[in-house]
Amino acid sequence: MSTAGKVIKCKAAVLWELHKPFTIEDIEVAPPKAHEVRIKMVATGVCRSDDHVVSGTLVTPLPAVLGHEGAGIVESVGEGVTCVKPGDKVIPLFSPQCGECRICKHPESNFCSRSDLLMPRGTLREGTSRFSCKGKQIHNFISTSTFSQYTVVDDIAVAKIDGASPLDKVCLIGCGFSTGYGSAVKVAKVTPGSTCAVFGLGGVGLSVIIGCKAAGAARIIAVDINKDKFAKAKELGATECINPQDYSKPIQEVLQEMTDGGVDFSFEVIGRLDTMTSALLSCHAACGVSVVVGVPPNAQNLSMNPMLLLLGRTWKGAIFGGFKSKDSVPKLVADFMAKKFPLDPLITHVLPFEKINEAFDLLRSGKSIRTVLTF
């Protein structure tokens, strides 16, 4: 029996308040309106950015259905949708691509002006949410809301992917993998034979390492205070691993001494202001490129001496690895299917959706790289 055009009752993980666990609720998901797509979710990754909402570091209206790293199958579409059809395998896009704004038309930029990321409204483009629970509207989260058995997204925030792709793996392309991998191959444009330093060895940091290796870097130095992460970093391409706590001097000085004045490319994948500075200083003063990948704390500012850039350093950042999402996600899935990069080593746990709070405990304790929740 078709559910198209009807309200669907399903389970979702609702965050009602900051610093509280998720609650599995029975919610109602209204049909998609014009230029919207309703998706039956199959799998979703648990990302640090979701936890930033729980802690208040990333501000979005509550109550909300979080989650932004998922994959599923189109259940129905609203009027005017031409990019996908019911039955298509898709990845929702937290970084949309309208194709019409100045940024989408820019050949190098990818942060669509219709993105809900900088100042989250908690709604779709139309101005409301399709979620309700106990008679109350539940907000969306950055165009996606993948912590629900069904979600509704705008058609500018969904990409059709290979129908043979395993959704419990390629869901990582919806955020963490693409963010890290693209930071190396597209944002920094790592060159063959170069030396790289990667600060932070979570799922995104390890994806940076995969990107550096794919780009032909000769040395990839992994930096983390958790030595338990070193084996996985080396498995994925790190040539050396160092712990800042093992040294009496600042880690940037250690890296400068190891690399004849500094690395060619550095990546901060933690989201701390002090490590952003360390990553910048660890790259060569005259030719180094440092990329900010980690999401910094809300409303905190970083001060620095302009002389650090005057000799030729470059300091840059990007959302979603610099990829134009609708264009790039299908290609990244195709590359995965062609075995151009691995995803399996990033997935340390697979849990049923109902165990979402256990997944966040694993994330906060540092015991997981990526936990995938299946519906």
From Swiss-Prot:
Essential cofactor(s): Zn(2+)
Protein name: Alcohol dehydrogenase 1
Catalytic reactions on record: a primary alcohol + NAD(+) = an aldehyde + NADH + H(+); a secondary alcohol + NAD(+) = a ketone + NADH + H(+)
Flavoprotein is among the record's keywords: no
Pfam families: ADH_N, ADH_zinc_N
Gene that encodes the chain: Adh1
Binding positions for Zn(2+) 2 per the UniProt entry: C98, C101, C104, C112
InterPro entries reported in the protein's UniProt record: ADH-like_C (IPR013149), ADH-like_N (IPR013154), ADH_Zn_CS (IPR002328), GroES-like_sf (IPR011032), NAD(P)-bd_dom_sf (IPR036291), PKS_ER (IPR020843)
Binding site for NAD(+): G200, L201, G202, G203, V204, G205, D224, K229, V293, G294, V295, R370
Protein family membership: Belongs to the zinc-containing alcohol dehydrogenase family. Class-I subfamily.
Enzyme class: oxidoreductase
Species this protein is from: Mus musculus
Modified residues (N-acetylserine): S2
One Gene Ontology cellular component annotation held by this UniProt entry: mitochondrion
